[in-house]
């Protein structure tokens, strides 16, 4: 059987990258199932070609270890978030680069907290269909609609790309707090403003990507799909630019809700694997075997 994200089994002690499954979705407000996202991505990753032609390298060669899923406590959001933060922190303190697989988008808050505790300050790049800036949703501050409100109040600089749904209060908050907003409709009309996005980010960046940033024609298996999303090429171009120009301290990919359409899981797995390869090239763990293809 092919192993996840490549053909090489990298022991934890030797791995540079830890893929951390976070199968938590207690805060979803529409379609359920994001708790099955991590397992579906890992299963799909077994079918990927280890060598990525576009990168001219095989990301598996950085040394990838898939950790055990983070446990969570039914009906106890605060305790579940504590467990997520502590598990991420454990891997970070061991010197690993962590890419987390959600789960709903509420998991980003404890993941980012763990990264700041371990690594210091950085800015946030949030790629999503939704702004996720509600102070609370359906009575909970731990909602998947609220993580970036909480992170803003904790002082994180925020850049949002691909947004298609945002209420008036969230827009006012974003303007007040200096959020750099690059909505999907502008990207479709004017092109992807990479130079502006890069200027808005700090030198060190944490990336959080909700799969519903992609158009539902490409990524139907999400909890809250919206038309008018980004293409796979636009997302890859964005990631390549950020990894090329910035130090990416960590990532999460969230909100895949498998519904039997396996092409969505394959797309998600390919995107995660590509990002790991970009980190490998950025950090010098990989070198391009082939240029100018």
Swiss-Prot record:
Keyword annotations: Cytoplasm, Hydrolase, Manganese, Metal-binding, Polyamine biosynthesis, Spermidine biosynthesis
Binding locations of Mn(2+) 1: 105, 128, 132, 210
Residues that bind Mn(2+) 2: 128, 130, 210, 212
Reactions listed under catalytic activity: N(1)-(3-aminopropyl)agmatine + H2O = urea + spermidine
Matching PROSITE patterns: ARGINASE_2 (PS51409)
Enzyme class, broadest EC rank: hydrolase
Pathway(s) per entry: Amine and polyamine biosynthesis; spermidine biosynthesis
Cofactor requirement: Mn(2+)
Major location category of this protein: cytoplasm
EC number, as in UniProt: 3.5.3.24
Deleted gene: phenotype: Cells lacking this gene show a significant defect of growth at 78 degrees Celsius and accumulate N1-aminopropylagmatine. The double mutant of speB and speE shows defective growth at 70 degrees Celsius and significant defective growth at 78 degrees Celsius. It accumulates agmatine and N1-aminopropylagmatine.
InterPro entries: Agmatinase-rel (IPR005925), Ureohydrolase (IPR006035), Ureohydrolase_dom_sf (IPR023696)
Keyword field contains Nuclease: no
GO biological process, one term: spermidine biosynthetic process
Pfam short name (any one): Arginase
Cellular component terms per the entry's GO annotation: cytoplasm
Record-level Gene Ontology MF annotations: agmatinase activity; aminopropylagmatine ureohydrolase activity; hydrolase activity, acting on carbon-nitrogen (but not peptide) bonds, in linear amidines; metal ion binding
PANTHER family with a match to the protein in the record: ARGINASE/AGMATINASE, GUANIDINO ACID HYDROLASE, MITOCHONDRIAL
Note: In T.thermophilus, the biosynthetic pathways of spermidine operates via N1-aminopropylagmatine without the production of putrescine.
Family: Belongs to the arginase family.
Function of the molecule: Involved in the biosynthesis of polyamines which are thought to support the growth of thermophilic microorganisms under high-temperature conditions. It seems that long-chain and branched-chain of polyamines effectively stabilize DNA and RNA, respectively. Catalyzes the decarboxylation of N1-(3-aminopropyl)agmatine to yield spermidine and urea. It cannot use agmatine as substrate.
Name the UniProt record assigns to this protein: N(1)-aminopropylagmatine ureohydrolase
Protein species of origin: Thermus thermophilus (strain ATCC 27634 / DSM 579 / HB8)
